Amino acid sequence: MKRLLPSLRAKKRYLAFELISEEPASRSDIVKEVMSSASSLLGDVTTSDCDIRVLGFENGKGIIQCSHTKVKQTRASLAALTRINGKRATLHVLGVSGTVKRATEKFLQDEGVFSS
């Protein structure tokens, strides 16, 4: 099967974020709460269109992938997140980039997320 041309592929954006919380959280906790927050704020159909994925999370910082047309909705759903595992928490978006490499270099220097 032939690969799609780059112009026909789904375009993505990468949101660098930091977790501000009372207690540390794991990647699986963040995935669960981000999807729950997006689903309750946006609904199931729009959440599916956002195509949200948590790519990496270490030391309270990480990267989330989403559709390039749904960046605003994704940021809104992250802002609506107030609790992780029953403890007060919020995700602060540090910035948006078109590549994982640039998001890591620009927003997550010295953090070890996706570092070789």
Curated annotation (Swiss-Prot):
Record family assignment: Belongs to the eukaryotic/archaeal RNase P protein component 2 family.
Reactions catalysed according to its record: Endonucleolytic cleavage of RNA, removing 5'-extranucleotides from tRNA precursor
Any one GO cellular component localisation term in the record: cytoplasm
Subunit structure: Consists of a catalytic RNA component and at least 4-5 protein subunits.
EC numbers, comma separated: 3.1.26.5
Keywords: Cytoplasm, Endonuclease, Hydrolase, Nuclease, tRNA processing
Main location: cytoplasm
GO biological process per UniProt: tRNA 5'-leader removal
InterPro entries per record: Pop5/Rpp14/Rnp2-like, Rnp2-like_sf, Rnp2_archaea
Species the sequence originates in: Methanosarcina mazei (strain ATCC BAA-159 / DSM 3647 / Goe1 / Go1 / JCM 11833 / OCM 88) (Methanosarcina frisia)
Pfam families per record: RNase_P_Rpp14 (PF01900)
Lineage, opening ranks: Archaea, Methanobacteriati, Methanobacteriota, Stenosarchaea group, Methanomicrobia
Record's keyword annotation contains tRNA processing: yes
One GO molecular-function entry: ribonuclease P activity
Compartments reported by the entry: Cytoplasm
Function: Part of ribonuclease P, a protein complex that generates mature tRNA molecules by cleaving their 5'-ends.
Protein name in the entry: Ribonuclease P protein component 2
